[in-house]
């Protein structure tokens, strides 16, 4: 009987991909889903949006390449995860931010949060959100200076800052004067980070990812739904207040593109629902009772940290597993 040819199998370290989708394919779909929001951002805030995106994406890619080379690891630029991180970080920044600060946030997101823990699939918190939070703590003025949308179209106008809708709403569940119309809120004519204002574009991108089965609807729906329920109670039954809360801040960006990150979210349905509800609860409580007007970033980071515990509680036990009983002697001891 002739000998069978020996086939060498390469077994790599976890996490193992259990899908027909490749990492680069998944990331490419995320980039495609972000294009409507990017186009809306350029319309709202001008060509500087592209410059910020180029800086964050370029710095993320360079940081990943150099850090992995120094650590003598393989080049992973081809998986496009650094591009997605750079794009999402840019979406979390105001259009007026100095470019060098955007570059610092990119280095932190890639080197400190991602590569020091082993690279893609190993980080325990979302890199883009962590980069944003560190920039917010380090440069609070730059990170909270919001340029009025569409001002760039008036060539003779000087930069005019504006408040975000969340800072204009009272903590008592009431609407204040001067808020943009709900139509303006939908299309993004309001103060905010360059990629978070146009709710319609973000929803289109989120629906695309769900249709392509890149993300599960469990996290975004439970996240947004929890915020809606709490704000309905806080707003004393006012659906208008709920609508403003859902369309304000980074809720749509966070729910569809940040909380659904594969590495930092649960893998089973029950865990995802708990994760989304937790994000919604924390976001709502920070908005209603915290000193900061927005809580999406902080809520996602906190729930990222709890993911191992959520998975421990919600992962089904293998069939036939029986809980080991304590021996009588051990109980007396």
Where on the chain are the PLM-derived regions?
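N-terminal signal-anchor module of multipass membrane proteins
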Residues: 1-61, 331-333
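Alpha-helical transmembrane segments in multi-pass membrane proteins
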Residues: 29-37, 52-64, 81-86, 90, ...
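Loop-to-transmembrane alpha-helix initiation sites
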Residues: 124, 128, 243-251, 272-274, ...
């Amino acid at each position: 009987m002739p000998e069978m040819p020996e086939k060498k199998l390469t077994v790599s370290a976890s996490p193992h991909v259990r899908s027909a989708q490749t990492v680069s394919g998944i990331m490419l779909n995320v980039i495609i889903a972000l294009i409507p929001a990017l186009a809306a951002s350029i319309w709202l805030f001008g060509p500087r949006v592209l410059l910020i995106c180029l800086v964050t994406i370029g710095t993320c890619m360079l940081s990943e390449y150099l850090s992995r080379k120094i650590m003598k690891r393989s080049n992973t630029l081809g998986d496009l995860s650094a591009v997605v991180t750079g794009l999402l970080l840019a979406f979390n920044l105001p259009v007026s931010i100095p470019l060098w600060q955007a570059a610092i946030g990119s280095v932190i997101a890639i080197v400190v949060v991602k590569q020091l823990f082993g690279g893609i699939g190993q980080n325990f918190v979302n890199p883009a959100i962590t980069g944003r939070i560190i920039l917010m703590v380090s440069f609070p003025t730059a990170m909270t200076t919001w340029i009025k949308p569409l001002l760039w179209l008036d060539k003779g106008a000087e930069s005019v800052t504006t408040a975000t809708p969340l800072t204009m709403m009272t903590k008592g569940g009431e609407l204040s004067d001067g808020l943009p119309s709900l139509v303006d809120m939908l299309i993004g004519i309001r103060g905010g980070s360059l990629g978070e204002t146009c709710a319609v574009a973000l929803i289109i991108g989120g629906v695309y990812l769900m249709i392509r089965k890149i993300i599960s609807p469990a996290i975004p729906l439970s996240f947004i739904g929890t915020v809606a329920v709490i704000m309905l109670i806080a707003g004393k039954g006012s659906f208008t207040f709920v609508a403003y809360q859902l369309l304000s801040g980074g809720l749509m960006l966070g729910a569809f593109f940040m909380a659904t990150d594969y590495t930092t979210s649960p893998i089973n349905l029950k865990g995802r629902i708990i994760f989304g509800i937790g994000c919604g609860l924390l976001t709502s409580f920070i908005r209603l009772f915290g000193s900061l007007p927005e809580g999406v970033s902080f809520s996602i980071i906190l729930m990222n940290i709890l993911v191992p515990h959520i998975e421990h509680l919600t992962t089904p036990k293998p069939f036939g597993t029986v809980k080991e009983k304590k021996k009588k002697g051990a109980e007396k001891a």
